Swiss-Prot record:
It catalyses: an N-acylsphing-4-enine + H2O = sphing-4-enine + a fatty acid; N-tetracosanoyl-sphing-4-enine + H2O = tetracosanoate + sphing-4-enine; an N-acylsphinganine + H2O = sphinganine + a fatty acid; N-(9Z-octadecenoyl)-sphing-4-enine + H2O = sphing-4-enine + (9Z)-octadecenoate. It comes from Danio rerio (Zebrafish). Endoplasmic reticulum ceramidase that catalyzes the hydrolysis of ceramides into sphingosine and free fatty acids at alkaline pH. Ceramides, sphingosine, and its phosphorylated form sphingosine-1-phosphate are bioactive lipids that mediate cellular signaling pathways regulating several biological processes including cell proliferation, apoptosis and differentiation. May also hydrolyze dihydroceramides to produce dihydrosphingosine. The gene is acer1. The keyword Transmembrane applies. It is a multi-pass membrane protein. GO terms for cellular component: endoplasmic reticulum; endoplasmic reticulum membrane. This is Alkaline ceramidase 1. Belongs to the alkaline ceramidase family. Residues 1-27, 78-83, 137-139, 189-205 are lumenal. The chain crosses the membrane at residues 28-48, 57-77, 84-104, 117-136, 140-160, 168-188, 206-226. Keywords: Calcium, Endoplasmic reticulum, Hydrolase, Lipid metabolism, Membrane, Metal-binding, Sphingolipid metabolism, Transmembrane, Transmembrane helix, Zinc. Its main location: endoplasmic reticulum. Ca(2+) binds at residues 13-14, 16, 18, 27. The keyword Metal-binding applies.
Length: 266
């Protein structure tokens, strides 16, 4: 049992050289880059609070769980232990489960599901089964998790096919662009390590951490905005960027322009 906590007990080892900067931290840059989770999560919790208050406070679970993903990611890269790998991957699975339960469009629910509560129960059941199955072939977990991004991309494509709103489309393209950059780094670190070692640049997995957190901030805000437009249209949701709306780079969030003024009564 103690073996699962041992350093390097995971079968996964990223391109970064082990113990290069510290004898206690296996992958130093990969560990430190996970700090981005602790920077972005509190900001997103703060920015999404008005939307969460109006829609459902459970929305906050997404970014609260992202803090745990950050903790487990740090622990995993610090030790490369089997326990670290499983905690890292299972926390991502549970963030996805929360996201699907909250935001998967009602109109695409399977016909036997009558409301969002039943849908959330179905997601919970599938997630518990997936959690148990993840121990069968742990090296396959990361690939399975990455497939969810493909499904999210497909769902966004279906939702935005007929959208002409410039701000929404801009956010969609930014989310997709960030994800493409992120997954290119992840794949390149996984499969192109000998090439990157020749260039003495083995930091792509750390860069992936930064890009995937940004992609999650962008894509989850877009999905939450589409959800708000359908579920709480009376609150007149709109998109803005923090810290300045007119800056090219910023964190997207939802403002509710109609709360308390135009709320429907029936
Ligand atoms: C209608 C559905 C709405 C769901 C929205 C919720 C989206 C957020 C989901 C997940 C958060 C991703 C957190 C990534 C943490 C990375 C930690 C890490 O690096 N782990 C690696 C090991 O250190 C491991 O190998 C990585 C495994 C793969 C993770 C795949 C995550 C899927 C990301 C989905 C992002 C959405 C982007 C959408 C693009 C338009
Ligand atoms: Ca390594
Ligand atoms: Zn990682």
């Amino acid at each position: 049992m103690a073996g699962v906590f041992s350093y390097e007990s995971s079968e996964v080892d990223w391109c970064e050289d082990n113990y290069k900067h510290s004898e206690n931290v296996v992958e130093y840059f990969n560990t430190m880059s996970s700090f981005i989770f602790f920077v972005i999560s509190p900001i997103m919790l703060y920015l999404l609070h008005p939307y969460a208050k109006e829609r459902n406070l459970a929305v906050h679970l997404v970014w609260i769980m992202m803090v745990f993903v950050g903790i487990f990611s740090m622990y995993f890269h610090m030790t490369l232990s089997f326990m670290g790998q499983m905690l890292d991957e299972l926390s991502i699975l549970w963030v996805l489960a929360i996201g699907y339960s909250l935001w998967f469009p009602r109109k695409h629910f399977p016909s036997f599901v009558k409301d969002r509560t039943s849908f959330a129960r179905l997601v919970l059941t599938i997630t518990i089964i997936s959690t148990l199955s993840s121990f069968v072939k742990p090296t396959a977990n990361a690939y399975a998790l990455n497939c969810f991004a493909i499904h999210i991309l497909y769902s966004l494509f279906v939702e935005l096919k007929s959208c002409t709103d410039e701000r929404v489309l801009r956010l969609a393209w930014a989310s997709i662009g960030l994800w493409v950059l992120a997954i290119s780094c992840w794949i390149s670190d996984r499969f192109g390590c000998s090439f990157w070692q020749k260039l003495d640049f083995c930091y792509l997995h750390g860069i992936w951490h930064i890009l995937i957190v940004m992609a999650t901030a962008y894509a989850s805000t877009l999905i939450a905005y589409l959800d708000a437009s359908q579920e709480i249209p009376y609150s007149l949701p709109d998109l803005q960027y923090w810290p300045r709306n007119n800056w090219a780079i910023g964190l997207p969030y939802i403002v509710l322009k109609g709360t308390n003024t135009t709320r429907k009564t029936c």
